Design a protein with these regions (language model features):
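Conserved N-terminal structural module of periplasmic/extracytoplasmic solute-binding proteins
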Residues: 2-9, 17-119, 133, 358, ...
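A structural signal for short loop-to-beta-strand junctions that line the ligand-binding cleft
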Residues: 103-105, 135-173, 205, 335-340, ...
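Extracytoplasmic/periplasmic solute-binding protein
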Residues: 153-159, 164, 189-247, 286
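Conserved C-terminal helix/tail region of periplasmic/extracytoplasmic solute-binding proteins
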Residues: 174, 199, 406-463
Length: 463
């Protein structure tokens, strides 16, 4: 990465900077903190797909760069891609944020990591900028909350959210004698469908559920939390107790979720273990297994179609006819009957950015109604701007948008407090242990409890 040094902080109030920047783009040369660095060059870091043929983010940012440079003569935008699987991306990003020599002006932050980076002092609070930005009122409150620190300040502008459910191959299901309008009521229904695929459709992976430490947060959120949050009635968080502000040790629901994962791999209903523990398994699910009819069921996210749209490199215009969608059921079919997890990403400004004010102007360009809608559709994302969500042009833009948007009613958000990344890693280790058979469910749960105490500094409770 090219180094970015910060320039000395000025004594002018941030709110004054916002007013100046909004009023006159040409004054942006004077806007920005830090020491050194080129005040006319904005460095924007982003997560680049590990699949060379998928250029969704690259194409979108290139268009925003063009718009921004045209509106701000003399300013240049340098796009700084980080090409890595999720777990490696987070590590590389944090390394960049530690020094003014390497910190970009704008970074793409997963909401699960943002509180950890806030606590580490890596990010700049955006409240002075947001106070002068009328469009901020258009964002839904839950999306805003995902980018808030424990200090009550906001550190990121969300660019969409997501939900999760079950994708299934209608062709594989037909061969397995399963219905095209499949909607499982319980976890056992999901496993039974996978068993039918295994028995009747040889050569096809019956079910993919992400697992293990190499896969990173996808294992925790797409699989484990989709299971864990379906073990109760949805009224309380099974991972974190908000009243006591303590993390919850492995209880029955936790063990049941591990048992589901163990069952998938013990009965060989999932991919080969070596494939399941490949950091790039998600790329294979989207780019190979589903399009080629080699996978029966995928527990995955709303964003998958971004890899199949025109210009994506893996064009698959028939996907909406060849794939079915079903909500993930609760464990025993108990109310509310369905479960989803939501996360999303935000644009954040590093504390050591050279040009923070210029960076926020770039965020405002990205988040106009038109540009935000363009991104939601291209990225197969769920809108976080109320005006876009209410626009028929958005809901009709792509098959599946309405289905996944409706799951917001049943969705949950991770307790993304500073300890969460370490808690998530402990979950992944427990999953990996039962996937490989290195530990029983009971052993993995005990090891998790020990790791949880370390991750949470002893702030744990049992329920």
């Amino acid at each position: 990465m090219r180094p970015t040094a910060a320039r000395p902080r000025t004594t002018v109030r941030p709110t004054a900077f916002v007013a100046l920047c909004a009023a006159a783009p040409l004054l942006l040369t004077a806007c920005g903190g830090g020491s050194g660095g080129d005040p006319d060059t904005l460095k924007v870091s982003f997560k680049q797909s590990t699949d060379n043929s998928v250029k969704v983010m690259d194409t979108y940012l290139a268009d925003i760069k063009k718009q921004f440079e045209k509106a701000n003569p003399g300013k240049k935008v340098e796009l700084v891609p980080i090409k890595a699987p999720d777990a490696e991306y987070y590590t590389k990003l944090q390394q960049m944020l530690r020094s003014p020599r390497t910190a970009p002006d704008l970074v793409y932050e997963d909401t699960f990591l943002i509180n950890s980076d806030i606590t580490s002092g890596y990010l700049k609070p955006l409240d002075p900028y947001l106070a002068g930005w009328k469009d901020w009122d258009r964002f839904i409150d839950t999306a805003k909350a995902a980018a808030k620190g424990e200090d009550g300040k906001t550190y990121g502008v969300p660019d969409g959210t997501d939900t999760r459910g079950l994708w299934f191959s209608k062709d594989v299901f037909a061969k397995a004698g399963l219905p095209a309008d499949w909607q499982p009521r319980t976890w056992e229904d999901v496993l039974d469908a996978a068993r039918a695929v295994k028995k009747r459709v040889p050569g096809v992976i019956p079910l993919n559920v992400y697992t293990g430490k190499p896969v990173g947060e996808a294992a925790t959120m797409q699989t484990f939390e989709m299971l864990l949050y379906g073990t109760n009635d949805g009224s309380s968080d099974p991972l974190y107790d908000k009243d006591s502000k303590k993390w919850i040790t492995a209880g029955k629901g936790f063990r049941d979720a591990l048992t589901f994962v163990e069952t998938v791999y013990k009965e060989k209903l999932g991919p080969d273990v070596a494939d399941a523990l490949d950091p790039n398994v998600g790329t294979r699910v989207r780019g190979e297994w589903l399009p080629q009819g080699r996978l029966g069921i995928a527990l995955d996210g709303s964003w998958l179609p971004q890899d199949w749209l025109e210009g994506s490199g893996h064009e698959w215009p028939e996907w909406s006819k060849e794939l079915g969608l079903a909500a993930m059921p609760t464990q025993h079919g108990q109310a509310p009957g369905k479960v989803s997890m939501s996360g999303g990403w935000t644009w954040a400004i590093p504390a050591k950015a050279a040009n923070p004010d210029l960076a926020f102007e770039f965020v405002k360009t990205m988040q106009t109604k038109a540009n935000a809608q363009k991104w939601y559709v291209a990225n197969s994302g769920i809108a976080v701007r109320e005006d876009v969500a209410a626009d028929p042009a958005y809901t009709a833009a792509q098959p599946g948008i309405r289905f996944f948007t409706d799951l917001v009613e049943h969705t949950h958000y991770r307790p993304a407090y500073p300890a969460y990344p370490k808690v998530s890693t402990a979950i992944q280790e427990a999953m990996e242990a039962v996937t490989t058979g290195d530990a029983s469910v009971e052993e993995a749960a005990r090891d998790y409890d020990e790791a949880l105490r370390d991750a949470a500094g002893g702030q744990v409770t049992s329920k």
